[in-house]
From Swiss-Prot:
Pfam families: Ribosomal_L27A. The gene is rplO. Belongs to the universal ribosomal protein uL15 family. Binds to the 23S rRNA. Part of the 50S ribosomal subunit. HAMAP family: Ribosomal_uL15. It comes from the Bacteria. It comes from Rickettsia prowazekii (strain Madrid E). GO terms for cellular component: large ribosomal subunit. Keywords: Ribonucleoprotein, Ribosomal protein, RNA-binding, rRNA-binding. GO terms for molecular function: rRNA binding; structural constituent of ribosome. This is Large ribosomal subunit protein uL15. Disulfide bonds: none annotated.
Length: 150
């Protein structure tokens, strides 16, 4: 047997019905669309229409909204800054700003930056920070060791 002698078994592959190819084809004239009306015309697709029953979109209640004035913050933790200091990516002499954190790779976009102190009860290095927001605990820890919030 050669490749050019291969063929499908009988009935394994059914030819598709060619519609609108004359009355004798069995799907001619109206091409299975019925007679007249909106759904027999071309370009019809009534989105969300369920045949007169109340559509799903109307049956479900409205929920919430998207506030356009919401500020998106990059959250950074004090221990992330401590790690960057020990790695040598940041220095205690520098003023730590949003741009510096982006350069070092602690944040990945230019949204606002908020400093938190989750899981950090002590902080050794006195730093100068110029960020957009601070948690009260982070503020306290930085000022306790002689750091500045600009």
């Amino acid at each position: 047997m050669k490749l050019n002698e291969l063929y499908n078994n009988l009935g394994a592959k059914k030819n598709k019905k060619r519609i609108a190819r004359g009355i004798g084809s069995g799907k001619g004239k109206t091409a299975g669309r019925g007679i007249k009306g909106q759904k027999s015309r071309s370009g019809v697709a009534i989105k969300g229409f369920e045949g007169g029953q109340t559509p799903m979109i109307k049956r479900l209640p409205k929920r919430g909204f998207k506030c356009i004035s919401t500020k998106k913050y990059n959250i950074i933790n004090i221990y992330n800054i401590e790690e960057a200091l020990t790695d040598g990516r940041l220095s205690t002499n520098d003023i730590i700003t949003k741009e510096k954190l982006l350069e070092v790779g602690l944040i990945n976009n230019k949204n606002l930056v908020k400093l938190l102190s989750i899981c950090s009860d002590d902080f050794a290095s006195p730093l100068s920070l110029k960020l957009d927001a601070y948690s009260s605990k982070a503020k306290y820890l930085i000022e306790k060791v002689g750091g500045q919030l600009l």
